Structures are given as C-alpha cells and as structure tokens.
Amino acid sequence: MRKLKMMLCVMMLPLVVVGCTSKQSVSQCVKPRLPPAWIMQPPPDFTWQTPLNGIISPSERG
C-alpha cells in the first residue's frame, strides 16, 4: 500500500509543478457595442394627442 501511495505521489508531482508554473490564458476584454441610434433619441412628445381620459371613462355603476 505504501508503494502505491509513493507511486501516485511521484506521478502527480510533475502535474502539480507544471500546473503552478504555466501561464493562465486570459481572453481579451471585448468592448460592448454601441446602442442603436433610436435608443439615444429623446422620447416623442405625445401631449398634443387626445388624452386617454377623454376617450376612456369608467363605466357607471347602477
């Protein structure tokens, strides 16, 4: 049993050493795309249209 543990330790040691000394690959930071132009425009002004309270009214209770 002791021989098996020693053999595992000897086999794992190079993997540990290589893993600790190798450089980690880091992906480049991707810049986000610009938003579409219609998002950047101010919202339209709908105050000139008929207000909804003139079109929709609560029904009478009866």
UniProtKB/Swiss-Prot annotation:
Q: How does it sit in the membrane?
A: Lipid-anchor
Q: Which locations, inside or outside the cell, does it occupy?
A: Host cell outer membrane
Lipid-attached positions, S-diacylglycerol cysteine: 20
Secretion signal span:
1-19
What GO cellular component term, any one, is given? host cell plasma membrane
One of the protein's GO biological processes: viral release from host cell by cytolysis
Pfam families to which the protein is assigned, alphabetical: Rz1 (PF06085)
Lipid linkage positions (N-palmitoyl cysteine) = 20
Q: Where is this region: Proline-rich?
A: 32-44
Q: Which UniProt keywords apply?
A: Cytolysis, Disulfide bond, Host cell lysis by virus, Host cell outer membrane, Host membrane, Lipoprotein, Membrane, Palmitate, Signal, Viral release from host cell
Residue ranges, Periplasmic compartment?
20-62
Q: Does the keyword Membrane apply?
A: yes
- Record keyword tRNA processing present: no
According to the UniProt entry, the note on domains is: The proline-rich region is an essential fusion motif involved in host membrane fusion leading to lysis.
The UniProt entry's sequence similarity note says: Belongs to the Lambdavirus o-spanin family.
Under the subunit heading, UniProt states: Homodimer; disulfide-linked. Interacts (via C-terminus) with the spanin inner membrane subunit (via C-terminus). Part of the spanin complex which spans the entire periplasmic space. The spanin complex is composed of one homodimer of the i-spanin linked by intermolecular disulfide bonds involving two Cys residues and one homodimer of the o-spanin covalently linked by an intermolecular disulfide bond involving one Cys.
What does this gene product do?
Component of the spanin complex that disrupts the host outer membrane and participates in cell lysis during virus exit. The spanin complex conducts the final step in host lysis by disrupting the outer membrane after holin and endolysin action have permeabilized the inner membrane and degraded the host peptidoglycans. Host outer membrane disruption is due to local fusion between the inner and outer membrane performed by the spanin complex.
Q: What is this protein called?
A: Spanin, outer lipoprotein subunit
Q: State the species of origin.
A: Enterobacteria phage P21 (Bacteriophage 21)
Q: What is the lineage of its organism?
A: Viruses, Duplodnaviria, Heunggongvirae, Uroviricota, Caudoviricetes
